[in-house]
Amino acid sequence: MSADRAILHSDMNAFYASVEMMLDPKLRGKAVAVCGSTENRHGIVLAKSELAKRAGVKTGMVNWEAKQRCKDLILVPPQYDQYLKYSKLAHEIYYRYTDLVEPFGMDECWLDVTGCEIYGKPLEIAEEIRQSVKEELGLTVSIGVSFNKIFAKLGSDLKKPDAITVITKQNFKENIWPLAASELLYVGSATTKKLASYGIKTIGDLAATEPSTLKYMFGINGLKLWRYANGTDESRVMQKDFVSPVKSIGHGITCTADLDNEEEVLHVLLELSQDVGHRLRVHGLAATGVQIFVRNKSLYSTQYQYKLPFKTQLPSEIAAAGFQLFKEHYIWTEKVRAVTIRAIDLIPQTTEEQLSLMVDYERRDRRVRLEDAIEDLRRRFGKKSLTYAGLLGNLKMPDDGRDSVKMPGLMYQ
């Protein structure tokens, strides 16, 4: 791999569950699931141990179904502060070799070790990292070693747990092309279904498809898919301090229990929009569009978007637009498992806008002053110092005190 880039992708195996078992020796060697609500039988499995996985427990299952699959399953509540702590400790190990470390969630990272021969060959560096994480943190990782980010990520998925997989220009067709197209990063259920309708079922099928056909199907993203499948992705691993240009701002969660009705969905959207509105203000941006992403209890995902008649930073307006989208499009055949709301088509807040006869600007000005005051109070006294009365009580959301890790936005669903 000396003539190529050397990219590693490190994935901490069954991360939440592994941290719990490392912290509590009584859990080791047992089937464990981390759940948003351990008391509620309709709580959701957020992560599971390897033994639980072998018994058929899946992330996103409700508690009672997981217990049916695995009678000896032990349910534990999440400790987000501990997960963040061990995520940061793993990152410190990665930084011993390179400052080109790009997080992909709390438990995954890309590392560019091109030109780092002083530490050994890429495979040797991967082996050192694997051993260091195990010895110093008591956790295991699977690492993919390849010449681009996409194949490195696939490599880390191929062997689990505690393993290393090398994908080269010489062997990727043999190892990668037979895999289902859905295994490719950023390809979700809707894209997989559309590809299948054209007879494209494997990554190899995707690689052999004419780029013009994929562009017709998915626009510019279709060409990216073709490059990913053919191993020609050249996207860089970003330096640890790199901040990408803000193209959209969103917030989403997997609920601790399934949402049963529109009122519960509205409350979740309003709570998520508080964070979105705050971050828009921090960046000095305003949204001219809103997008929502909804996953049902069968883990089928859909997304919808709407062009706003005005620019906004207001959480209430962002949530209202998202809720309108939900009411117009979501069919209640199943309960809702996860929700994301995103501010899109961003412009500088200082951008002049054309006035519309359809907007009550006097009412909007009052709302702006109110939410400015709320933002100021939260900045001075903390996020929980003031909230809407409708957001009190059980929102079926994870503990608000958790730390979150930024991730690249979903490209495909």
Where does each model-flagged region fall?
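DNA-contacting surface of Y-family translesion DNA polymerases
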Residues: 9, 183, 191-335
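Short, charged/polar surface micro-motifs in flexible loops or helix N-caps
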Residues: 15, 38-41, 297-300, 346-349
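C-terminal hydrophobic structural anchor segments
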Residues: 317, 323-380
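Short Gly/Ser/Thr- and Asp/Glu-enriched loop/turn motifs at secondary-structure junctions
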Residues: 104-108, 146-149, 285-289, 334-338
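Gly/Gly-Pro- and Ser/Thr-rich, intrinsically disordered tail segments characteristic of DNA damage-repair
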Residues: 1-227, 237-240, 278, 364-413
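Short, hydrophobic beta-strand segments
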Residues: 109-115, 303-306, 353-359
